[in-house]
A protein has these predicted regions:
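Intrinsically disordered, low-complexity terminal regions
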Residues: 1-164, 168-314
């Protein structure tokens, strides 16, 4: 049951120990969520105040605080310093004396399922351990940090950053600057129209599918780096970029006649200029393969086929 702080001059707090719905009376401009297990959905509202729907609580109560325009949804014992802070909490706390409770439950044995509806211009920060994250329609900037849970990002604009340890990220129709960092998680970008992508992963695969925005076309600005992950990039038609793609031991595949493939044994490169070379594409992997693909023309019949990694081709 929710408990509201009686002091209106101080931050307003609630504790959710069961399923509950709440509509916030004060405007929300920044959202901070940090959770362990379960699901978190953040959806942009077309109009009206911010809302929270808690459909499941298993473990300690969910702690909600509204301090001015900042709304925080979390637990009282969780740190707020991104995925590394959550990872350290998860790795160290279970082995400390306080980890057990009178009920026999361990500190990390908790789960919630929540949906937050906020104005599209809200700045959104989500940090989670083992929770599935879904964010849709946000234009105020989105920052997602996960330890092992996967994240799905749909229709976002503004700056988007995703940092994972082992979770994968799928970004659909993202139009802002996009940054991704992971140890072993993969990245899939579908119909990305922003053209600005910075991504690095140690072993995760990267599939980048870009679609030009006819209303405001921008040159691509792509920098990808991986150690052992495979990289596949599909560029919009017509493509316009200076290209340099390298792999030390992997295979290469190139669909553009204007690009040159060099290297027979060992290191291989794809280099050259597409169109006027206004954009930049740089991709590097040590042992993974690289594929540069051509997206069908915008007036071609039907949507472009989904981009997948074909290890037989790569």
């Amino acid at each position: 049951m929710a408990e509201q702080s009686p002091e209106s001059s101080s931050p307003t707090t609630w504790h959710f120990a069961e399923a509950q719905k709440l509509t916030f009376g004060e405007p929300v401009t920044e959202l901070r969520v940090r959770l362990v297990s379960g699901t978190v959905n953040v959806v942009a509202a077309e109009e009206g105040p911010a809302r929270l729907e808690v459909t499941e609580v298993d473990g300690p109560p969910l702690y909600v605080v509204q301090d001015g325009g900042t709304l925080t949804v979390s637990y009282e014992d969780l740190p707020w310093n991104g995925s590394q802070g959550l990872k350290q909490w998860f790795e160290t706390k279970p082995w400390k004396a306080w980890a057990g409770s009178a009920s026999g439950r361990k500190a990390w044995e908790r789960s919630v399922a929540i949906t937050l509806t906020v104005p599209a211009a809200t700045q959104v920060h989500v940090a989670a351990v083992g929770a599935a994250v879904f964010v849709s329609g946000i234009s105020g900037g989105t920052d997602v940090n996960t330890v092992s849970g996967d994240a799905t990002l749909v229709g976002l604009s503004g700056r988007v950053k995703a940092h994972t340890v082992s979770g994968s990220v799928e970004a659909q129709s993202v139009s802002g600057e996009f940054g991704f960092h992971s140890v072993s998680g993969g990245l899939t970008v579908v119909d990305g129209s922003g053209g600005n992508v910075r991504a690095d992963s140690v072993s995760g695969d990267m599939l980048i599918d870009l679609a030009a925005d006819p209303a405001a076309p921008e040159p691509v600005d792509i920098f990808l780096n991986s150690v052992s992950g495979q990289v596949a990039i599909r560029l919009p038609h017509p493509a316009d970029a200076k290209v340099e793609a390298n792999t030390a031991t992997g295979r290469v595949s190139n669909a553009f006649e204007d690009l040159r493939v060099s290297g027979q044994m060992g290191a291989k490169r794809i280099t050259g200029t597409l169109g006027s070379g206004a954009g930049t594409l740089r991709a590097t992997t040590v042992s993974g393969s690289i594929a540069l693909l051509r997206r069908p023309q915008a007036d071609a019949e039907g949507p472009a086929a989904p981009l997948t990694l074909d290890k037989k081709v790569l």
